[in-house]
Amino acid sequence: MGKGTGSFGKRRNKSHTLCVRCGRRSFHIQKSRCSACAYPAARKRTYNWSVKAIRRKTTGTGRMRYLRNVPRRFKTCFREGTQATPRNKAAASSS
């Protein structure tokens, strides 16, 4: 049997599984390498010929649990656990 239409029904093994770094189904099982982010290599795989792909995966497209709070915390020089001073005099005199 050739590799054309008739043989596609016989394909049942997965060559790629989920990658632990990027989460995509791009980790090649036999090669042990991710085709999307190049895990386990230290440097993440990006190419400028795929600008749209970089735009999809860049910082700001996800939740940014930590990073979205940094500008607000920067205003107070990253102080934490202190009591805020009252803004108006009436609240300051009553307490």
UniProtKB/Swiss-Prot annotation:
Superkingdom as given in the UniProt entry: Eukaryota
Function text: Binds to the 23S rRNA.
Name of the featured protein: Large ribosomal subunit protein eL37z
Cofactor(s) the protein needs: Zn(2+)
Organism listed in the record: Arabidopsis thaliana
Keyword Protease: no
GO molecular function: mRNA binding; rRNA binding; structural constituent of ribosome; zinc ion binding
Cofactor note: Binds 1 zinc ion per subunit.
Binding site for Zn(2+): 19, 22, 34, 37
Keywords: Metal-binding, Ribonucleoprotein, Ribosomal protein, RNA-binding, rRNA-binding, Zinc, Zinc-finger
